[in-house]
From Swiss-Prot:
<dbReference type="GO" id="GO:0003735">
    <property type="term" value="F:structural constituent of ribosome"/>
</dbReference>
<dbReference type="GO" id="GO:0000049">
    <property type="term" value="F:tRNA binding"/>
</dbReference>
<dbReference type="InterPro" id="IPR031310">
    <property type="entry name" value="Ribosomal_uL5_N"/>
</dbReference>
<comment type="subunit">
    <text>Part of the 50S ribosomal subunit; part of the 5S rRNA/L5/L18/L25 subcomplex. Contacts the 5S rRNA and the P site tRNA. Forms a bridge to the 30S subunit in the 70S ribosome.</text>
</comment>
<dbReference type="InterPro" id="IPR020929">
    <property type="entry name" value="Ribosomal_uL5_CS"/>
</dbReference>
<keyword id="KW-0689">Ribosomal protein</keyword>
<dbReference type="InterPro" id="IPR002132">
    <property type="entry name" value="Ribosomal_uL5"/>
</dbReference>
<protein>
    <recommendedName>
        <fullName>Large ribosomal subunit protein uL5</fullName>
    </recommendedName>
</protein>
<keyword id="KW-0699">rRNA-binding</keyword>
<keyword id="KW-0687">Ribonucleoprotein</keyword>
<dbReference type="GO" id="GO:1990904">
    <property type="term" value="C:ribonucleoprotein complex"/>
</dbReference>
<dbReference type="InterPro" id="IPR031309">
    <property type="entry name" value="Ribosomal_uL5_C"/>
</dbReference>
<keyword id="KW-0694">RNA-binding</keyword>
<dbReference type="Pfam" id="PF00673">
    <property type="entry name" value="Ribosomal_L5_C"/>
</dbReference>
<dbReference type="InterPro" id="IPR022803">
    <property type="entry name" value="Ribosomal_uL5_dom_sf"/>
</dbReference>
<keyword id="KW-0820">tRNA-binding</keyword>
<dbReference type="Pfam" id="PF00281">
    <property type="entry name" value="Ribosomal_L5"/>
</dbReference>
Amino acid sequence: MSRLREKYEKEVVPALMERFGYKNIMQVPKLEKVVINIGVGEAKENPKALEAAMNDLMMISGQKPVITRAKKSISNFKIRKGMPIGVKVTLRRERMYEFLDKLFNIALPRVRDFKGVSPNSFDGRGNYALGVREQLIFPEIDYDKIDKVRGMDIIIVTTAKTDEEAKALLELLGMPFAK
């Protein structure tokens, strides 16, 4: 069992039950999944870029990403429906806990001028979205092997009903929120 999952079961659950007055352990919010998405805008001119993004994401997440395709054609962006425009991966269970542990304790502190993540990025339903500007903050990515600095979106989906509950959950798990 991963470190973060153990922390959740031993420390976070009792703390949340006390703070929000849950009667049943099943009411306590928990992490459902983490979705990591890399939008590859240059995929239409450069098919190799999609492959490179896939490899980066595979190394970061430890899981094979799936290619996302355009839902509809947009002439301004010169994309047609069905064209590959990015890669994403959905992590659940152990892999999710391991990824978040790595994100909170290793990757985020490596961001330049890092003062904490914004506490305003919740969506109103207890999910958190985080944008990362470069994939280099992850220890698995070798600086010499990347073709281009790529950002990514990390969405943390929880079972919390409100943003307040979700923030408490993530804070107790060790998410470094800005003060």
